Every structure is written in structure tokens, then in C-alpha cells.
Regions:
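N-terminal assembly/interaction segments in proteins that build large macromolecular machines
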Residues: 1-203
Length: 203
């Protein structure tokens, strides 16, 4: 580049982007989810990469934090070029395919509280004072943990369709059919299995 620093920088950047394009077809099955909250608003960003090693890399995690913080500060509700470019910049330095797959934002109302743990949960209360209550906030966080662990489908057990419960009972009875135990004991095991299953799919 004949000693021209700007030309050298441009050359290196173009070379880096060309390398990124070559890696674009590689599968990105690893990654991280970053959640940031402020002023009753939450932003969730999903960054993907090829390997678990990069997913745990401090620079990769820092980019995820920066993306979520920028989206939160600027009011972005989906993927923007400014955010994608942050990942692209890292990809030119780390020889691995990576990207910003998704980004979403949630704004809580005046009667709502946002909690997060890999997932975002918004709880609503008709009592404004409850939103600042420690027990209420801990409950919201517990809901996040439950959602992350089990991906529940219903709010409460009463919401579960009766036909679905009958199907599960049939499955569980099939599982204990060969046990050398009295029928009443088998039925107790079935009820226990159903109770555990409902606890997982409901909040």
C-alpha cells in the first residue's frame, strides 16, 4: 500500500470481509442469548457462532452485551445494520462464522414488571405497590427459571385440555403396566407422574 496507512487499513478490512464471506456457509449451532433491562424495557439478542469455544469467549460475550445495550439505548426492536456490523467486525478478527440471528424488545406497562433469565417474563398486577415488592419480584424470577427449564404451555393446571390429560394418563399407565405392584400402587405412581408433568408444563 506504499506506506499509506488508510489504504492498508482498507486492504486489511476488505481481506477480512472476504474471509468472512467464505465462512458464511458454515453451520452456526452454538451461541449465546443476552438480555438487558432498563426503565421497564427489556431487549433480548441471540448471537450464533460455530463452536462452544467462541460462544464462551470474552470478546464474543462482550459484543453480545454491547448489542443489547445499544438496542436498549436507541430503542431498536429488531436486528439493525449497526448491530449486525458489531458481530461482523468481530468475525473479521475471529476465524469463525457468526451472526446476530434475532433481536426483540419488550416494553412493560405501568402495571407490569419485567424479569429475565435467558427468557423474558412480564407479570401484570392490579396493585401497583406489588411491582416493587421483593416477594413479587422473586416470584417473577422463579417464573423465568421455570420457563427456561420447561417451556410451559399453560398458566395454570385448570387451563390444560381434558383430552390432553387423558392422553398422558394412558401413556403413564402404559409405562407402569409391567410393574409387579398392586393396581392401587400403580395408579398412585400414574397420578404422581401426571402431577409432575403438569407442574412442568404450567406456571
Amino acid at each position: 500500500c506504499n506506506g499509506d496507512a488508510k489504504e492498508a487499513e482498507k486492504f486489511l478490512k476488505e481481506k477480512g470481509l472476504a474471509a468472512v464471506e467464505k465462512r458464511a456457509s458454515r453451520a452456526t449451532s452454538e451461541g449465546i442469548i443476552v438480555v438487558k433491562t432498563a426503565n421497564a424495557k427489556a431487549v433480548m439478542a441471540e448471537l450464533t457462532c460455530e463452536t462452544d469455544f467462541v460462544a464462551k469467549n470474552a470478546d464474543f460475550i462482550a459484543v453480545g452485551d454491547k448489542i443489547a445495550e445499544t438496542a436498549l439505548a436507541k430503542g431498536y426492536t429488531d436486528v439493525q445494520k449497526e448491530l449486525s456490523d458489531m458481530v461482523l467486525d468481530l468475525a473479521t478478527r475471529v476465524r469463525e462464522n457468526m451472526g446476530l440471528r434475532r433481536l426483540t424488545a419488550v416494553q412493560a406497562g405501568s402495571d407490569e414488571y419485567i424479569a429475565h433469565y435467558v427468557v423474558i417474563v412480564v407479570l401484570k398486577s392490579d396493585k401497583p405497590d406489588a411491582l416493587a415488592d421483593k416477594a413479587f419480584q422473586e416470584f417473577a424470577y422463579d417464573c423465568c427459571l421455570h420457563a427456561a427449564a420447561f417451556t410451559p404451555l399453560y398458566v395454570k393446571k385448570e387451563d390444560v385440555d381434558a383430552a390432553y390429560i387423558d392422553e398422558q394418563l394412558e401413556v403413564f399407565r402404559g409405562q407402569v403396566a409391567e410393574l409387579q405392584k398392586p393396581d392401587n400402587v400403580k395408579e398412585g405412581i400414574v397420578k404422581g407422574k401426571l402431577s409432575k408433568h403438569l407442574a412442568e408444563i404450567c406456571f
